[in-house]
């Protein structure tokens, strides 16, 4: 006869004979429980003809000494097995490690193919491990806040005193749709969106704190299939392992609400490179996250500096190294400079001079063309995937990203404007699964045709037609790029207080424009120290004015990173250098500059500066030699010609009418920046341009 057994592990079918003993029957029932599921406590096993406590429950030990025919079962009966899980052995190892990106699914017992087991969710980690996820400080801050939107007493509708409250003045939820519409907030903030998801759960339910509300989108085929009922893809596929169809809509929230540039000089640095070369530039944004008060529970990114990677600029594009080789080192130096400082995004130029007026830029990104091209969107999504956001609100321990993208492009007035955006969470999933590609038309994205051994799910996009009805359209072969990103506002502070005060040191990776070198460091530091009669090698004799000038000179992101990467300072001294560069922003760190002056690396640098200054002093010609080399009298010694004022003889001398060559063969004035070069090279020490013009 056929009997059905329903247990917490699922439903199974057993074929037994009337003469089957109770012991064999009990063993067959236990075999329906997969080995990967929690095993039952033998003392709690019971069999019933009704679920729960409604029917007659028979303990397992009562089956001993009997046969199936004696138990009164009929063909097709449904029996209910109940038990309590056995307590876990504390010495046993966990079944799945939290760090495993693709946990192996539990395989059902092949001897019972009809046993049904719920497959585990792909790319998940046990909930108990989410407590170890380290969230950013801004997320920890907003989790502790109520997020309510406070309202004042309405004099027109409120009929109560100052200490009372009614429907017209009570605080609103951060996701209130009416407030969002009145203040023209297109996207909810990340934490307001979380509050909206959690608001649908009962406040007393434990799931409100145990089950993460966010579910990362996965568009890849799960291999191997969690059911184990067929070979892995591409040899087999089922509804469990294949991804669901995708319906694209405008993302209702954004991870970052605003981008604030700490100083206009950050943007000016990129623009100056484009103005001098005419080629495009890209840089990574160095900044930190902070609260943004203009939207409920908002988050903004404050950009303090940029780092330009190795690249080759072109008139209409650029080539940049991938992956970015110096990222880990730059991240480390940024962390030393200020708490929370890290790589937060990227910025690049897309500027073209107007053919009618080269002093203006071409306006090519607008509502009738595109804001961000499909290729740019795929690039943004790829960088966001490499910079995920750590959060306990997702079963995987991370969700989307706060990596932002900015573009400097022409505006309608011929000036330069900043466009900022983020790729949506769906865009990240589609790029990760490799189902989209860039198009020749920058305003649309192509859905890839699946190749051999590939699976591309159905993709749709939804919009409102001219009648106000929601319409769903297939996205193959193309769909608008607007479905893959959210716009971000940007601006500058009214009272700038940048973390880095100087930008005099050359920017990295600009060969031919201006190069970084120790000679530039020595020249700039010597120019500050020579304004005082104090001894260069003894920082203790420097007046307060000189120390302040040195501190401001050190507060340069490009200078700090250059010195840290030169090997002149030890690891501990590099940390002191970063502290000294940002000491003005940390009033409690008053001894950072003195610690730097006392370090061995700084003393070595001063020794080099001192020896360079001494060598220059010995090589400088007398005051009148410049006039003698030009064949004219010195204004200080104008009068009858004397033997001492005669032009020096030798190959370096230049007579009157012979032309003005390099002064004494050493000093040469740069025709570009007018700096007097005292070396015999062919390029200027400051601007790096040829001295021959």
UniProtKB/Swiss-Prot annotation:
Function: Involved in the import of nuclear-targeted proteins into the nucleus and the export of poly(A) RNA out of the nucleus. Has a role in the endoplasmic reticulum-associated degradation (ERAD) pathway.
Xref: Pfam families: NPL4, zf-NPL4
Its membrane topology: Peripheral membrane protein
Biased amino acid composition, Low complexity: 644-655
Taxonomic superkingdom: Eukaryota
Phylogenetic placement of the source organism: Eukaryota, Fungi, Dikarya, Basidiomycota, Agaricomycotina
Statement: the UniProt record of this protein carries the keyword Glycosyltransferase: no
Membership in a protein family: Belongs to the NPL4 family.
Gene: NPL4
Subcellular location: Cytoplasm, Perinuclear region; Endoplasmic reticulum membrane; Nucleus membrane
Protein name according to UniProt: Nuclear protein localization protein 4
Region (Disordered) location: 85-132, 615-662
Annotated TM spans: none
